[in-house]
Amino acid sequence: MFEGAIGHFDCALVTNCQNLRNIIFRGSVSSTGGQGFAHNCPKLDSVIFESTVVYFDLDLLKDSKCPNLTKYIRHGVFLKVYNNKIASIADIDYLKSNPRLIKDLKKTAQWQAQILTAKNSDWMRSNEYQSARILYPVLKALNSKEADTLKAAMNYAWSLGDEVKTKLDILKESPKYNSEPPFDMAFRYAEPSDRMLRMTRKKFNLDKIAGNGDDISRMKNLLYWVHDNIEHDGSNGLAPGARNLENTYESARRNSCGYNCRALAICLTEALLAVGIPARYITCISKGWETDNDCHVICIAWSKSLNKWVWVDPTFAAYVTDENGIMLHPGEVLYRLQHDLPLILDEEANWNNRVKQTADYYLKEYMAKNIYFLETNIWNQAEPEGENNHPQGKTVTLVPVGLTYPHANYNTSDEKWFWQTPL
């Protein structure tokens, strides 16, 4: 039994308790983290929260070795939950009728305010800011004076920089693009008659895979084919040898392994080019690239029927549409994220056919972080990089006004030029 208030707990809090049957939290909890809560507690059948939890971010894992634990029991209040199938949210009317729970929420707010204004609280400040975002409007609705104190602490934490901001917050604050004088160059795309593309097209029978439908149908078929035939393994880098579809595919088969998002994007780009669909792969880079070495690589494909580029991501079998089902390109997705406009992630989006993706995570967290800078090749062809016997292109990065990405050959803030129609 936990008697007092808890600020935050994370990951497996209870492990290897063979005779433990129940856990009770008597006091309030500001936030939880991690999907695993208990591990190897075979007799555990109930976890009860008797007070308030601002953000309940727990799930029930099949491999937790707690076979009898099938739900969490709420006797108090959850203000926000990660999975509403295993825990429900209490409404404000229920809260207003329970002075004890209101008192506990006020104590949580006081603790959050201390964390937000403390020195050297870094990670905890960032975590509790997100929890405070949930609690503040509730306190406001209750006409609690603690709401003003908490808001002041939140404003102070925000003023310190990006520390407490979500990836979407940072993206919304990014400088805008402008229209510069265009480069004296245009993007180039290898024709299907290119020798290497003809070989790829024939070897994999890509015309049959793409099918006889419209251009959207054909690019989706190729997207799913690459996704289903080459697993993603971000830790395994690129396939040894040539950076092309044939070598990556054969290496993955031969070694029973996957490769990183860049490898998959190179493969899909080559497949699209081989059937006559102009395509580029885009390296999506975070604002904090100097310390954040995680980026993500997707593809864009030119749709004649829509007269624009569209987003296709072979790592997650993902594409993105607006509220009318029209496929979008990364620039349109970025704009809609910045302006809170509807974004729909396709229902099939998943990782390695094992983990389903959601718009909240994939777009508003993962890609919101990674579409601050967008880098692409000017010359798009089979084997676009690595050691080979044909000329390599240069890279250009689309950057917000006033910023540069030094690893690109060129930088531009002219988004119209970046998304130009293929010649």
Regions found by a protein language model. Name each.
Residues 11-13, 35-37, 60:
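Consensus positions within tandem repeat domains that build extended binding/scaffold surfaces
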Residues 125-142:
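Amphipathic, non-membrane alpha-helical rod segments
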Residues 158-259:
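Secondary-structure boundary elements
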Residues 215-220, 273-280, 305-309:
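Loop/turn elements at helix/coil->beta-strand transitions in domains of secreted/extracellular proteins
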Residues 234-298, 302:
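Active-site neighborhood of thiol-dependent amide/isopeptide-bond enzymes
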Residues 291, 301-423:
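His-Asp-centered catalytic microenvironments across diverse enzyme cores
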